[in-house]
């Protein structure tokens, strides 16, 4: 039985549109293309779907207004282009959505907005309020102020985090390809489109190697986004943006594109927030016993199971937990700073106070502040 019924039963969509589908070969906004996207989104909204749009295009629009022929390499110049272009992008959307009497809202997010629990909850409340008011939020990364070190990396990731934030049913990533293929269609004429796969399928890992089918065209980031969205129970459709009326067809469950469906129970809201933390301050390496305790028993991480500590972090920072082979097992908020963690690693809880002169917690990371990768 097809999993497309997951889509037809869904009412809350996050739609991500990349620059290639909004601009005229990178030479500024393509108003005709934008009009077509707005028409489709307005049609979904009229049918009762809740839609949040994650839109690229600000940098390209700014470059055109500034008279730049090629994308600048310097981050401050990219940020300047984004600052100029963001207003143009929203003006273009406002002009088109007015044709359908639809209200829109501009929302700019950066990593700090989602890494702070309070700001995360505020963003969620704002987006929910906008949707209740029948306003379509248009979201982009706040390129003007963000630094390279804390960028989301791409709008695929941002869209997945937004899907988690609002507990969306479907994340729809529009691309310049028809979807995901089992091999590179540019090299293999017999390459077949993958219609449906579990978001956590190991087969996708094998394909996502440097020489695999997903190693080109940004598909690796789309798989990562699908897996992140799956944590809140959202399924992801990766589909070609050149298909006529693609969004209504996706909503109708047509067999187009690739559906990477969530086949696990959604994790709790706090753990969704933890899973979305992209910036970690350190790494703790675990022994096999600790790995088993986290994976199989869902317990807290005790110092005795830690073999090594790297990085510099303070209490409350995000750290990554890895096994002896370097594979990420989990991530969580640490109860001790890096210096103290090194002193107590490999030691039983009963020795913490002797080693540190104090003991605030038995656990290095409590299970409530830990999420499996």
From Swiss-Prot:
Residues annotated for ATP binding in this entry: 16, 175-176
EC primary class: transferase
Chief place of localization: cytoplasm
Listed GO biological process terms: L-proline biosynthetic process
Keywords: Amino-acid biosynthesis, ATP-binding, Cytoplasm, Kinase, Nucleotide-binding, Proline biosynthesis, Transferase
SMART domains for the chain: PUA
Function: Catalyzes the transfer of a phosphate group to glutamate to form L-glutamate 5-phosphate.
CDD domains reported for this sequence: AAK_G5K_ProB, PUA_G5K
Organism annotation: Teredinibacter turnerae (strain ATCC 39867 / T7901)
The keyword Methyltransferase is assigned to this record: no
Subcellular location: Cytoplasm
Molecular function GO terms recorded: ATP binding; glutamate 5-kinase activity; RNA binding
Originating gene: proB
Name this protein carries in UniProt: Glutamate 5-kinase
Superkingdom: Bacteria
SUPFAM superfamilies recorded: Carbamate kinase-like, PUA domain-like
Signal peptide residues on this chain, from the entry's feature table: none
Family classification: Belongs to the glutamate 5-kinase family.
EC code: 2.7.2.11
Binding site for substrate: 56, 143, 155
